[in-house]
From Swiss-Prot:
Complex and partners: Monomer.
Organism in which the protein naturally occurs: Bifidobacterium adolescentis (strain ATCC 15703 / DSM 20083 / NCTC 11814 / E194a)
Domain of life: Bacteria
Spans annotated as G5: 175-177
Annotated PROSITE patterns: G_TR_1 (PS00301), G_TR_2 (PS51722)
Chain spans, region G4: 138-141
HAMAP family, A to Z: EF_Tu_B (MF_00118_B)
EC number(s) on file: 3.6.5.3
Protein name (Swiss-Prot/TrEMBL): Elongation factor Tu
Region (G3): 83-86
Database matches in InterPro entries: EF-Tu_GTP-bd (IPR041709), EF-Tu_GTPase (IPR050055), EFTu-like_2 (IPR004161), EFTU_2 (IPR033720), G_TR_CS (IPR031157), P-loop_NTPase (IPR027417), Small_GTP-bd (IPR005225), T_Tr_GTP-bd_dom (IPR000795)
GO cellular component, one term: cytosol
Length: 399
């Protein structure tokens, strides 16, 4: 069966839900897709809630581990929505997920207010450069006291303000459960609130200015074999555009290879080209499954080079932010998380600097054990034992 062509008629925006594990991110994602399906059925597929909440680990512990990608349209825009994992153990996915957002919906239960993970996600959103956050105050059907809701709202605004986000952002009172279930009390009211939330998303989260004119680059998130066709890599195009049948280089981790992209798909639809912001799958000619891996990038030939030695400027998280409890010294060996993967590196502090304390802003040299496609300005997280302990950017490439 011939696949539908993907039509680029409306502005495309990547958003996601972030926040504490039991506050209803996945239920809200399902409610948004249901309400929009009912309002604009010709452009919005119907998603089953279980499709969004489908990680196998989930049934046992009720926590979202994987990232669900769904798409929907409002009158003004086309959205790709990621439902981000909510648990601290899965911060690594949070980093790859949050890096995919032009804006985020922070879900906070009115019954609980902001929790530790709420704070961690807002901090992470700041670190990975999510430009705007607005708030869905969920479970409002379970709180009778308006004053209590106002207090929680104020607390959320303070939290955003502390992390460099706009405290005057839209805060929409919702009940994801009430909107999702036709037989819930006040169902119509909660459906209207979801519409109000999406109006706020349309108006408040700016249409991203994608770097279309820069050379093509796509970080590889996943690699598949499609029998009879070959190797497909998936990811979100970071910049530039790529017509089908173009040559690309596979850069990082291993020696650079050149290949041709023979097919481009997004959300199971064929495309003639992909561009910055698209979540896409690219079929690579003559490349085996074991020749390519997550953490590499596909790039326009000659546009980016692999490096192991650089200087970085880093903010080191405090203990309260979930960072280290003690200082580190030269020869400290954490992981450096670039785009989609961790690579171990050795830190060399500058002369005259004996140690770096939690809460410090520091500049130091790094030598990675594997090369990464790197440019000045590239951001990374410093991680240790599964926890983010620092956030930085490459200031100078050495070799």
């Amino acid at each position: 069966m011939a696949k539908e062509k993907y039509e680029r008629t409306k502005p495309h925006v990547n958003i996601g839900t972030i926040g504490h594990v039991d506050h209803g991110k996945t239920t809200l994602t399902a409610a948004i897709s249901k309400v929009l399906h009912e309002e604009y059925p010709d452009v919005n597929p119907e998603y089953d809630f279980n499709q969004i909440d489908s990680a196998p680990e989930e049934a046992a512990r009720g926590i979202t581990i994987n990232i669900a990608h769904i798409e929907y349209q409002t009158e003004k825009r086309h959205y790709a929505h990621v439902d981000c994992p909510g648990h601290a153990d899965f911060v690594k996915n949070m980093i790859t997920g949050a890096a995919q957002m032009d804006g985020a919906i922070l879900v906070v239960a009115a019954t609980d207010g902001p929790m530790a993970q709420t704070r961690e996600h807002v901090l992470l959103a700041r670190q990975v450069g999510v430009p705007k956050i607005l708030v869905a105050l969920n479970k409002c059907d379970m709180v009778d006291d308006d004053e209590l809701i106002e207090l929680v709202e104020e607390e959320v605004r303070d939290l955003l303000d502390e992390n460099g986000f706009d405290r005057d952002c839209p805060v929409i009172h919702v009940s994801a459960y009430g909107a999702l279930h036709d037989d819930a009390p006040d169902h119509e009211k909660w459906v209207e609130q979801i519409k109000k939330l999406m109006d706020a998303v349309d108006d408040y989260i700016p249409t991203p200015v994608h770097d279309l004119d820069k050379p093509f680059l796509m970080p590889i998130e996943d690699v598949f074999t499609i029998s009879g066709r070959g190797t497909v890599v998936t990811g979100r195009v970071e910049r530039g555009k790529l017509p089908v049948n173009s040559n690309v280089e596979i850069v990082g981790i291993r020696p650079t290879q050149t290949t041709t992209v023979t097919s481009i798909e997004t959300f199971h639809k064929q495309m003639d080209e992909c561009e910055a912001g698209d979540n896409t799958g690219l079929l690579l000619r003559g490349i085996n499954r074991d020749q390519v891996e997550r953490g590499q990038v596909l790039a326009a030939p000659g546009s980016v080079t692999p490096h192991t030695k650089f200087e970085g400027e880093v903010y080191v998280l405090t203990k309260d932010e979930g960072g280290r409890h003690s200082p580190f010294f030269s020869n400290y060996r954490p992981q450096f998380y670039f785009r989609t993967t961790d690579v171990t590196g050795v830190i060399t502090l500058p002369e005259g600097v004996e140690m770096v304390q939690p809460g410090d802003h520091a500049t130091f040299g790094v030598e990675l054990i594997q090369p990464i496609a790197m440019e000045e300005g590239l951001t990374f997280a410093v991680r240790e034992g599964g926890h983010t302990v620092g956030s930085g950017r490459v200031t100078k490439i050495i070799e």
